Design a protein with these regions (language model features):
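Extended alpha-helical scaffold/tether regions of large eukaryotic proteins
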Residues: 1-326
Length: 326
């Protein structure tokens, strides 16, 4: 333990060394070590410096392309993943999303949420009956109803994870969103101001794409479903569609620019409301008062300590005591 303490003391006295160790550790995918270095950064007061350094390197390397900056394999996103995997981050997401996930999993059949006419199951015509224009109109009506359902679900999800900018939830910054997430959003906001980046695009890439969207695409891996609830392959399609819709909002792109069947959603009133809502509310994520920000870093440090203790292997005596209690 003394050797480990001496190592950390040596690390925290040099910000440049800390960044170097982060860079090397994140590439090697050593999660526990990355978490320990993250703790060293927060305990020494250098966490902001480390994240800003990684952000600036990505901005320079990829010429301010926000979508590339937050690519899945970047060092920046691996740093962020350390904070996204903390218990408070996972708990917050479950509290906000679980009810909406269950609605999607249990209330509707897959064909009631399908948006692609090619994938929409055709209703069989009676023997000897030829489907005419009226039949095609019926299919169009089903698609319109499906778009209404999916737009409504997306609208509820967006409001759950991102309150309106004027919402009372924002009045107490210590209670909406946990400290690791809000702290990261503030640092991203600061980097965007420094480098004149598209703030909502980068914040949306972090918060909506890296944090919220994986739970929509794979809810069973994020503790969103009760043990007795399962998702069939056909139902999985509905979750994928919802995650694609949220991705469009996060990237601020026109619906239908990638997949033509999404184009009618661009004119849907609820989708347009979601676009305005996301654009305004994402900026609120990064607006953290200095006194509130000062309270966050000790909270993050404490949670990293507890998380590391949970990752640590038990000593033989501890294991025997645990077995005896059981």
């Amino acid at each position: 333990m003394k050797d480990w303490e001496q190592f950390l003391q040596g690390v925290v006295t040099r910000k440049d060394v800390l960044v170097f160790l982060f860079r090397d550790t994140l590439r090697s995918k050593q999660d526990a070590v990355a978490k320990a270095l993250c703790l060293a950064a927060f305990s020494s007061g250098h966490a902001g410096f480390v994240l800003q350094t990684l952000l600036e390197e990505e901005v320079t390397r990829f010429e301010q392309d926000c979508n590339v900056i937050l690519r899945g394999t970047s060092l920046l996103t691996k740093w962020m993943d350390v904070l996204l995997q903390l218990p408070s981050s996972r708990t917050f997401l479950v509290e906000r999303l679980r009810r909406h996930i269950h609605v999607l999993a249990s209330r509707y059949r897959a064909d009631e949420l399908e948006l692609d006419p090619v994938r929409l199951p055709q209703r069989a015509a009676p023997p000897g009956v030829v489907v005419d224009a009226a039949g095609e109109m019926e299919e169009d009506g089903r698609l319109a109803e499906n778009r209404d359902r999916m737009a409504s679900i997306l609208h509820e999800v967006v409001k759950a994870v991102l309150p309106a900018a004027e919402s009372p939830e924002w009045q107490d910054d210590k209670h909406f969103l946990n400290a690791p997430l809000r702290w990261t959003c503030k640092e991203i906001f600061q980097c965007c101001e420094t480098h004149h980046l598209h703030t909502s695009a980068l914040l949306g890439g972090f918060y909506l794409l890296r944090y919220v969207n994986p739970a929509l695409a794979m809810p069973e891996k994020h503790n969103m479903l009760d043990p007795d609830v399962s998702i069939s392959p056909s139902d999985r399609r509905s979750f994928i569609l919802l995650s694609k819709m949220l991705q469009n909002l996060a990237n601020d792109v026109v619906f239908g620019s990638k997949e033509a069947f999404m184009a009618p959603l661009q004119e849907h009133p609820l989708i347009q409301e979601c676009q305005r809502h996301v654009s305004q509310s994402l900026l609120r994520l990064g607006a953290v008062e200095p006194d509130v920000l000062a309270l966050m870093e000790p909270q993050i440090e404490e949670e990293l300590v507890l998380s590391l203790l949970g990752d640590a292997p038990q000593e033989e005596g501890d294991r025997q005591e645990s077995v005896a209690r059981d």
